[in-house]
Amino acid sequence: MSTPTPLSYKDAGVDIDAGNALVQNIKSAVKRTRRPEVMGNLGGFGALCELPTKYKHPVLVSGTDGVGTKLRLAIDFKSHDTVGIDLVAMCVNDLIVQGAEPLFFLDYYATGKLDVETATSVVNGIGEGCFQSGCALIGGETAEMPGMYEGEDYDLAGFCVGVVEKADIIDGTKVKAGDALIALASSGPHSNGYSLIRKVLEVSKADPQMDLNGKPLIKHLLEPTKIYVKSLLKLIAESDVHAMAHITGGGFWENIPRVLPDNCKAVVQGDSWQWPVVFDWLQTAGNIETYEMYRTFNCGVGMIVALPADKVDAALELLKAEGENAWHIGHIAARNGDEEQVEIL
C-alpha cells in the first residue's frame, strides 16, 4: 500500500511565501507614508496610532470604500499602478467633506491566486494615494482565496480614519440661501459609473485604444481619482466653508442633497463649465440622457464647496494656487415645499 503524498497549503492554492515576498516589496511604500503618531512597524497583529496632540477635542471620522468595476478594466488592460490611488481617494475625499484630516488607512486585497508583481503595483499605488493625502498606510490584509475569484482577478477595499476638532466639524448646518457654490474639477470619471462605462464599450463596440483628444480612450477611463485633501484642508483653514459634497455614485442629484438643510436647494449653472471630452464621448456613444449623466457621473466636477458669496474670489485664488481647476458653479437658494434640492440650469 503506497503512502499518500503529504499535502501542503501551497497544494491547496495558498502560497505563504508569495505573501511574505509581497510584504517585503511594499515596505518602502508604507514607510513613505508614516506619520509621527504611528507606533510600531508593519506586521503586528494590530496597528497603533496616537491622536495628534494639536486637537483639543478630537473627533474620529471613519470611512470605507472600494474601486468598483473600474477594477475590471484595470485587470483586463493590465493597468494596476493607479487603482490603489483610486482606493485611497474614494475614502479620504469622503472624510475631508466633514473637515477631517485623514490619519491612517488600511487596505484589503483579495484574490484567487496572488501575483506578487500585480499586488506590489496595487499597494504601491495605495502608498502613493496615502502620501498625496498625508495619511499613514498603517496596515492591511492580503487574502489569497482559491476558488473564490477567477484566476488572478482581485478586489480591493479601503478603510480610513481621520480626525477633526469637534468645534470645526463641517456638517452642512451653516448652509443658507445666498451661499455660493464652487466646483473643483475631476480628473475623469474617478471611480463611479464603470458598470455603465463598460456597457457603453460593449454596445458601441468602440476600440478602447482609439484616440480621444490626443490620448487613448482607455487612458481617459483609467485616469486615477483626484485627491482633494491638502487643498481643501488649506481652504478650510483660511475660509468659511459651510459644506462640501464629494460627487461620487449618484452624481449631482444624490450627493449634493446629502449636505443641504431641508430648506435649501443648490442651483447649478450648467453652462459654467465644459464637460471633459470623455463624458461627451460616453453620452454620445451610449445615447445617455443628460439627466442620467448627472445621476451616474461627476461630469467633470469632483467636489462642490458651499461658502459665503463674499469668500468666492479668495477661495478660487487659493485653490488655483494649490493646483486645482476651480470655478464658481452656482448658489444656494431657498427651497419651497417638496422642490428638488438640485436644479441644473
From Swiss-Prot:
Gene Ontology biological-process entries: 'de novo' IMP biosynthetic process; adenine biosynthetic process
InterPro entries tied to this protein: PurM-like_C_dom, PurM-like_C_sf, PurM-like_N, PurM-like_N_sf, PurM_cligase
Predominant location: cytoplasm
UniProt-annotated location(s): Cytoplasm
EC top class named in words: ligase
Matches recorded under CDD domains: PurM
GO CC list: cytosol
Keyword Secreted annotated: no
Enzyme Commission number, as recorded: 6.3.3.1
Keywords for this protein: ATP-binding, Cytoplasm, Ligase, Nucleotide-binding, Purine biosynthesis
Listed pathway(s): Purine metabolism; IMP biosynthesis via de novo pathway; 5-amino-1-(5-phospho-D-ribosyl)imidazole from N(2)-formyl-N(1)-(5-phospho-D-ribosyl)glycinamide: step 2/2
Gene Ontology terms for molecular function: ATP binding; phosphoribosylamine-glycine ligase activity; phosphoribosylformylglycinamidine cyclo-ligase activity
Catalytic activity: 2-formamido-N(1)-(5-O-phospho-beta-D-ribosyl)acetamidine + ATP = 5-amino-1-(5-phospho-beta-D-ribosyl)imidazole + ADP + phosphate + H(+)
Presence of the UniProt keyword Nucleotide-binding in the record: yes
Family: Belongs to the AIR synthase family.
Name recorded for this polypeptide: Phosphoribosylformylglycinamidine cyclo-ligase
Native organism taxonomy: Bacteria, Pseudomonadati, Pseudomonadota, Gammaproteobacteria, Alteromonadales
The gene coding this protein: purM
